Amino acid sequence: MDPGLQQALNGMAPPGDTAMHVPAGSVASHLGTTSRSYFYLTTATLALCLVFTVATIMVLVVQRTDSIPNSPDNVPLKGGNCSEDLLCILKRAPFKKSWAYLQVAKHLNKTKLSWNKDGILHGVRYQDGNLVIQFPGLYFIICQLQFLVQCPNNSVDLKLELLINKHIKKQALVTVCESGMQTKHVYQNLSQFLLDYLQVNTTISVNVDTFQYIDTSTFPLENVLSIFLYSNSD
């Protein structure tokens, strides 16, 4: 081949090092950004599903009634984002015979969660971390918890359990801080729903394995337990 042509072709070809070398820091930064974006999208989706599910139940309740009585305006609690939407839905719902809306206690020291006693309790009794049913019927139960994990050197399992009479009926489980992740802080939302027929004196409680990770500072109003009587024999 002509030496001049060979030299021109060599000048057009990109250097092998330039084409293949990508700084390790750039890759780690890109992965960290992708992980955070995925987490925020997942949290927003869960919150939207929570509101949508409760709203759907409310529509079904409204369709079963002839009129909706005026709701009280003196409810002392005010939530933020998802919990605020949930509380607003409950305040405007036609059922008033039996319902409750409680926020998690500020200081937790055991796996069975305790709740603020100054929440809304109507036709339901609260005792030692339990909601105690006073009227039999079909109840809708919802619990939402926000976790903040300072990642240790190992993965962490976050679990939320809904218990009826001390027996686990529903649970949600997620593993965070897995090996290879670049982030040091993880925000994780867990929620669970249950529709079940409950008798008088039935107890409802919530357990978590890692109560120390429940975020009562950044999102104190996002940790709620709520129930309402959807249908009874009356």
UniProtKB/Swiss-Prot annotation:
Residues linked to a glycan: N81, N109, N153, N189, N201
Record's GO cellular component terms: extracellular space; plasma membrane
Cytoplasmic side: 1-37
Chief place of localization: membrane
Transmembrane region(s): 38-62
Extracellular side stretches: 63-234
Swiss-Prot/TrEMBL keywords: Cytokine, Disulfide bond, Glycoprotein, Membrane, Signal-anchor, Transmembrane, Transmembrane helix
Function of the molecule: Cytokine that binds to TNFRSF8/CD30. Induces proliferation of T-cells.
Family: Belongs to the tumor necrosis factor family.
Matching PANTHER family: TUMOR NECROSIS FACTOR LIGAND SUPERFAMILY MEMBER 8
Record-given protein name: Tumor necrosis factor ligand superfamily member 8
